[in-house]
Amino acid sequence: MKNCVLKGVLALSLASSFALAEGGFAGVEGGYDFNSKLTGGLKDNRPNIGIKGGYDFDIARVYGGYFYHAKAKDSHGSIVDAKWTNHKFVVGGEYTPTITEDWKLIAGLYTGLSTINFNAYNNKGAVIEMYDVTKVGWLLGAKVGGEYSFDKNNALEFGLKTDKTWYPSAYNLDFKSTDVGAYLGYTYKF
């Protein structure tokens, strides 16, 4: 946990240094994963929230951020009462061409680290195993959407994003997760 907090503080300080420059931005984002899947058939819907900051070059931008994905629950086959949450630390780049005076297209890629906390029971008849796993994995994602600027400093961003994470194996479980969802965010431009 200390390691996650340290990485979060480092990412925020990096984002803050970008935000102090001309063209810098900071923002908050909320979303809903309408398809959050783990290897083995486990899936659920769940909300997420995050913060980000970076530098806007007008036609493109770079950013760093932290996103928390709330608890998901499911049972599948012999795995019962599975619950998982994610903490995602990402860096990304986006192409942001102007469509009209107030509208921009957003298309980008991001990568980073994702921490999963997974708890479940495996019911094998007479034997019940309990899993309590925390793993850090590499994620790769993409997003597409739009941005509407109210004025030179305030903007509303919305769209769809998806990412896939590969975690190290634990307890003979090969962890991979995929999240697909919609997001809505507010950005303040300096």
Spans of model-derived segments:
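Cleavable N-terminal export/targeting peptides
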Residues: M1-F25
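Outer membrane beta-barrel transmembrane domains
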Residues: G24, G145, E157, G185-T187
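Short N-terminal segments immediately surrounding and downstream of signal-peptide cleavage
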Residues: G24-G40
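Generic short beta-strand segments
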Residues: Y32-F34, Y68-A70, T162-T165
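Gram-negative (and chloroplast) outer-membrane scaffold detector with strong preference
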Residues: I51-A126, W138, Y148-F150, A182-F190
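A charged, solvent-exposed segment within the mature domains of Sec-exported extracytoplasmic proteins
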Residues: N119-D174
